[in-house]
Amino acid sequence: MTSLQLSIVHRLPQNYRWSAGFAGSKVEPIPQNGPCGDNSLVALKLLSPDGDNAWSVMYKLSQALSDIEVPCSVLECEGEPCLFVNRQDEFAATCRLKNFGVAIAEPFSNYNPF
């Protein structure tokens, strides 16, 4: 197993779903008051590196997840490459990425800062 040093990802706060007729190739955000069913997706966005190099890093991360049979897709979201995984696979995906040497940025709040 290789590692990707200095790669940091964070989970985008919104949930997504496949666009009708575009499963695997196009996503749309789920409204905040909408139901998050079993088919909802989470997006992991790369914080570093950025630019053209980000796409190759995201494809390597996608391959790392494919190696453990976690389905995922690398698609553009908010102008950046994002890795989309099924919501029920989020913990397996982040565990695999951590084992692969990727740092996962976690949100902080005033109520639970650490």
Swiss-Prot record:
Record-linked Pfam families: YejG
Domain of life: Bacteria
InterPro entries the UniProt entry points to: Uncharacterised_YejG (IPR020489)
Protein name: Uncharacterized protein YejG
Species: Escherichia coli (strain K12)
